Amino acid sequence: MSLCEDMLLCNYRKCRIKLSGYAWVTACSHIFCDQHGSGEFSRSPAICPACNSTLSGKLDIVRTELSPSEEYKAMVLAGLRPEVVLDISSRALAFWTYQVHQERLYQEYNFSKAENHLKQMEKMYMQQIQSKNIELTSMKGEVISMKKVLEEYKKKFSDISEKLMERNRQYQKLQGLYDSLRLRNITIASQEGSLEPGMIPQSGVFGFPPGNNSKFSLDHIPVGNQGGGDEDVQFRPFFVCSPTAPEPINNFFSFASPSHEAEQQVCSRAFKAKRI
């Protein structure tokens, strides 16, 4: 990049605009825009905003036109000796070169600062990415383990559901059986309750054949022997019934059969004999 392609910028730190029109040039080789130059150099003594140098000389601050007219360029150096013209030109070129060099240093400093900041941010983000990757790997492992646990629970739930359904079917079956037996017992009990209490049918007792319609009347039971004999006979109690079967222990369902219930009712009304 040639020097002519570079544009001078205002050396005021907060400004940094490209200069055009008029500018304020200082003896310490700094240049400012017309706005900040007129504002900063109106105080006495004037101090350079860029390097804080005191500008007390008459020509330490010059307001110059950056694009002079052709008439001005034709007359400003007229009559000067060549060495003076060259000296003025060399100083003007040195000022321009200094400004361009300082601007490049400033841009390189900003670039280096931004690059360092970018590296720090990149390093920080890489650390965060690594940390997040570790967390992500850990979470993936946890998800896999939780999926395995979930599958195990699903399998257990399915097995338990099948067992529960089987238990429900067994319960419904047993409940139906219980209801039918209960209804049957209620029907038998109601039929037996309708029989006459004084007349009890006997079957196969004291030599009477089964199906015999003879009935014992409780009013004709003999009390004792009135005529006397070798021995005095007195009726002793005994039960004319079948022996009662022992009740089953620890049985889930125990139902009495109808014949057993009828036999128990007959036993409750059995004859009692007394031997004298």
Curated annotation (Swiss-Prot):
Expressed predominantly in the testes and 17 day embryos (corresponding to prophase I in females). Weakly or not expressed in other tissues. Its EC number is 2.3.2.27. It holds the Pfam family zf-RING_5. One of its GO terms (cellular component) is synaptonemal complex. This is E3 ubiquitin-protein ligase CCNB1IP1. One of its GO terms (biological process) is chiasma assembly. Ubiquitin E3 ligase that acts as a limiting factor for crossing-over during meiosis: required during zygonema to limit the colocalization of RNF212 with MutS-gamma-associated recombination sites and thereby establish early differentiation of crossover and non-crossover sites. Later, it is directed by MutL-gamma to stably accumulate at designated crossover sites. Probably promotes the dissociation of RNF212 and MutS-gamma to allow the progression of recombination and the implementation of the final steps of crossing over. It comes from the Eukaryota. A zinc finger (RING-type) spans 10-52. Ubiquitinated; autoubiquitinated. Phosphorylated by CDK1 on serine or threonine residues (in vitro). Interacts with CCNB1, UBE2L3 and NF2. Pathway: Protein modification; protein ubiquitination. Residues 146-182 form a coiled coil. It comes from Mus musculus (Mouse). The keyword Zinc-finger applies. The keyword Metal-binding applies. Its main location: nucleus. It is found in: Nucleus; Chromosome. It catalyses: S-ubiquitinyl-[E2 ubiquitin-conjugating enzyme]-L-cysteine + [acceptor protein]-L-lysine = [E2 ubiquitin-conjugating enzyme]-L-cysteine + N(6)-ubiquitinyl-[acceptor protein]-L-lysine. It is an enzyme of class 2 (transferase).
